[in-house]
Regions:
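The structured alpha-helical core of multi-pass membrane proteins
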Residues: 5-13, 122-124, 171-174
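Export/targeting segments at the very N-terminus of extracytoplasmic proteins
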Residues: 8, 12-70
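Peptidoglycan-targeting cell-wall enzymes and recognition modules
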Residues: 29-50, 73-138
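Solvent-exposed, polar/charged alpha-helical surfaces in well-ordered, non-transmembrane soluble domains
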Residues: 49, 53, 69, 118, ...
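Metal- and O2-centered redox machinery and metal/ROS homeostasis
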Residues: 56-57, 72, 112-113, 180
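Short, functionally critical alpha-helical segments immediately adjacent to catalytic or ligand/cofactor-binding
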Residues: 63-78, 149
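Residue-level detector of well-ordered alpha-helical segments, enriched
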Residues: 64-68, 88, 116, 143-144
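Active-site or metal-binding loop neighborhoods of secreted/extracellular toxin and effector enzymes
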Residues: 142-180
Length: 180
């Protein structure tokens, strides 16, 4: 079930094109630097909306869903088939990659994107429970993005500005659509 906030956002004044939606996300990110802006394109914005829609349908609060999706954009553009240094959207490696492969086989009918987001939710309730608890206490998309990066992803190179900037863009787009 879609959260009412997200459902209202998606129903109100839907943009005429993905290009317009992308421009809205970028323009609404007042503190975005050029590095943050390079992550946004029409396909990623569309995928971001799909991810937020899916996560909120799984009872994830919208601001936390935005933080998670902002990290997925920064990690590899929400690409489900990425294999830079790991597997999938969040570049799982080692035991986490093996666990994902095992779980993926048990989710028939779900899209690959949904399977990967489902695995994130599974990890936040089990092996990454500490990250899940910390994330549940986030109050803004930016805070959720920071917590998810530090406690769940644990990347080699911290890039707070990029991930928090993307979360701000998603939050501002939602606020703009609700006010219209």
């Amino acid at each position: 079930m879609l959260s009412k906030d997200l459902e209202n956002v998606l129903k109100q004044r839907l943009p005429q094109s993905l290009k317009e939606l992308t421009r809205d996300v970028i323009d609404s990110t007042k503190n975005a630097n050029s590095h943050t802006r390079k992550f946004m394109n029409p396909e990623r914005v569309q995928r971001a909306h799909e991810g937020i829609r899916f996560l909120t349908s799984q009872n994830v609060p919208m601001h936390i869903a935005m933080g998670i999706i902002a990290n997925g954009i920064a990690e590899n553009g929400l690409s489900t088939d990425a294999h830079k240094h790991g597997l999938g959207i969040f570049q799982w490696i080692g035991a986490r990659a093996r666990q994902f492969r095992n779980m993926r086989a048990n989710l028939p009918g779900a899209t690959e994107f949904e399977k990967q987001l489902s695995f994130v939710l599974h990890e936040l309730k089990t092996t990454e429970r500490a990250a899940g608890v910390a994330l549940a206490n986030a109050r803004t998309p930016e805070e959720a993005a920071r917590i998810f990066m530090v406690k769940f992803e644990r990347p080699k190179h911290l890039n707070f500005d990029v991930r928090q900037g993307l979360a701000t863009g998603l939050r501002n787009l939602t606020s703009t659509r609700q006010e219209a």
